[in-house]
Amino acid sequence: EEKRALRIELNLPENARIGIYVGRVTKEKGLSYLVDALKRLDESWPPELCLLIVGNGDYLQEMQSECAALRHAKRVIFAGQQEQIQKYLNASDFFLSPSLHENLSISILEACAAKLPCLVTDVGGNGEIITNGKNGLMIEPYSPKAIADGIRKMCCISTYDTFKKNICKTDYRKFSDEQVDKQLESVYAYLLKL
């Protein structure tokens, strides 16, 4: 009910499977590969799929233009920069990050806190957060095919339900400020002994 109310408030389709990207809208975030994946999906677009892009950046206008040429252009929503990211996450069904380079993604951690299964590229620290096939999917970077296949899997009810159940069980406390502080202290203590 809360998700439905948020979708009405944010003017999002009520019965869609909403995948969300939150972040800078730039090519280094892999969004040109996402556009190519959407072109691949255009012929066999999952009927319930809607993608929500939240953020601004130097690729935004080009991305909007390329998506406008899709047959399913109305199913790709650009929300621009938003202050209340949590509302958009809570209104969505899964999180998407096709990034080409990543350290430890705050966006992915926020998506996990919102209990969203994640479709992310296997780069940087993403594997510390997402376990492939358990609480989401890890896909190869630079691959429109992998992104398209991952989106299809997120639209599959049984796969999605498994990820959703597991993301709710995953403990992300190891990424809390307190835990990170403890880890840094132990590194500093070790370095002082050298």
Task: Please identify what each model-predicted range represents.
Residues 1-12, 165:
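A short helix/loop element that forms part of the nucleotide-sugar donor recognition site in Leloir-type
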Residues 17-40, 58-64, 145:
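A conserved mid-protein helix/loop that constitutes part of the nucleotide-sugar donor-binding site
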Residues 176-194:
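C-terminal alpha-helical cap of glycosyltransferases
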Residues 81, 100:
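Aromatic "clamp/platform" in nucleotide-sugar-dependent glycosyltransferases that forms part
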Residues 64-80:
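Nucleotide-activated donor-binding/catalytic signature segment of Leloir-type glycosyltransferases, i.e.
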Residues 132-133, 137-144, 153-158:
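Conserved acidic donor-binding segment of nucleotide-sugar-dependent glycosyltransferases
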Residues 8, 159-174, 186:
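A short, well-ordered alpha-helix in the C-terminal region of glycosyltransferases
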Residues 117-120:
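Short hydrophobic beta-strand element within catalytic cores of glycosyltransferases
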